[in-house]
Swiss-Prot record:
CDD domains for the chain: cytochrome_b_C, Cytochrome_b_N
Recorded GO CC terms: mitochondrial inner membrane; respiratory chain complex III
Gene it is expressed from: MT-CYB
Cofactor: heme b
Protein name: Cytochrome b
Length: 379
């Protein structure tokens, strides 16, 4: 008798996705982050659902409702900090996943890669609107500053900003719609993730060598299910350590002050995972130029497959490209640090140099060095 998992219409899909899926035998732990992102998404949706049961999206009660969750709801503090630090874990996994894709040439599966970029944008949008919900000082001013960037769009900018605000400033209407967006977006992300997986399984997984592995596949279960469970245990350990010992380590103290439109915080800055893009935005003195650079810093990922000049897919056997890749990582860490610093000397010039280097590495140096490597290998 044929196993039910291979005949039942629903079980068959799950079987082909997580059990009998042919997987390259040599994929490393860098391939764990996809499943960890799925775990993060499920966890964020569940903790978010329980938070939404007690939260009120109204300017007069939002801040106190979050305090009520932390003080009066059973394990409310735990759910709230799991959700806040879960977002940080989500972005750590997301950036590692993208870094893996860049290093090993996974972007050559273009449909999967482009859906991935869409997913990144959706997660960033979700995190941004979610940060506004506690209605602290940084929530309010972060929302004001970032939405105001749209006013740089010629002709329709101001109208667009007021349309998003639902008035002439960030107020009750803004908070209510941001809560609605924050609630719906994770479900859109879930649907996109399913499409991401669908495209991935059309082309098969890449592997560290970048060479097709059709002749050497193993079933996903039990080999990679056990490997993913180990990764999940590490993720949960890190998240629980962060949540139970230093829950406010990655947050901003200003967000413990209720939103006040009459008092501006000394340094307005987003959460740590947006600081690199914020640094690029600030490094250009012109408003429209800054907004375009900010957009391009993320959307440049779409152009990565077109910039592939190497005849090898992976960087595994390309030491010069590896050097540039790690220079790019160092540059992104520098930008993250600069984004959290005040706008003064020497941070301004360091930020500008790091921003120029970011685009120069991706658009010029990496494709050029790939061509040189081809020549060295007489290709």
């Amino acid at each position: 008798m044929t196993n039910i998992r291979k005949t039942h219409p629903l079980m068959k899909i799950l079987n082909d996705t997580f059990i009998d899926l042919p997987t390259p035998s040599n994929i490393s732990s860098w391939w764990n982050f996809g499943s960890l992102l799925g775990l993060c998404l499920i966890m964020q949706i569940l903790t978010g659902l329980f938070l939404a049961m007690h939260y009120t999206p109204d300017t007069s009660t939002a801040f106190s409702s979050v305090a009520h969750i932390c003080r009066d709801v059973n394990y409310g503090w735990f759910i709230r900090y799991l959700h806040a630090n879960g977002a940080s874990m989500f972005f750590i996994c997301l950036y590692a996943h993208i870094g893996r894709g860049l290093y090993y040439g996974s972007y050559m599966s273009q449909e999967t890669w482009n859906i991935g970029v869409l997913l990144l944008l959706a997660v960033m949008a979700t995190a941004f609107v979610g940060y506004v919900l506690p209605w602290g000082q940084m929530s309010f001013w972060g929302a004001t500053v970032i939405t105001n960037l749209l006013s740089a769009i010629p002709y329709i900018g101001t109208t667009l900003v007021e349309w998003i605000w639902g008035g002439f400033s960030v107020d009750k209407a803004t908070l209510t719609r941001f809560f609605a967006f924050h609630f719906i977006l994770p479900f859109i992300i879930t649907a996109l993730a399913a499409v991401h997986l669908l495209f991935l399984h059309e082309t098969e997984s890449n592997n560290p060598t970048g060479i097709p592995s059709n002749m050497d596949m193993i079933p996903f279960h039990p080999y990679y299910t056990i490997k993913d469970i180990l990764g999940a245990l590490f993720l949960i350990l890190a998240l629980l350590t962060l949540t139970l010992f230093t829950p406010d380590l990655l947050g901003d103290p200003d967000n413990y002050t209720p939103a006040n439109p009459l008092s501006t915080p000394a340094h307005i800055k987003p959460e740590w995972y947006f600081l690199f893009a914020y640094a690029i935005l600030r490094s250009i003195p012109n408003k429209l130029g800054g907004v375009l650079a900010l957009l391009l810093s993320i959307l440049i990922l779409v152009f990565i497959p077109m910039l592939q000049t190497s005849k090898q897919r992976s960087m595994m056997f390309r030491p010069f490209s590896q050097l540039l890749f790690w220079t790019l990582i160092a540059d992104l860490l520098t930008l993250t640090w600069i984004g959290g610093q005040p706008v003064e000397h020497p941070y301004i010039i360091v930020g500008q140099l790091a921003s120029i280097l970011y685009f120069f590495l991706i658009l010029v140096l990496m494709p050029t060095v790939s061509l040189i490597e081809n020549k060295l290998l007489k290709w």
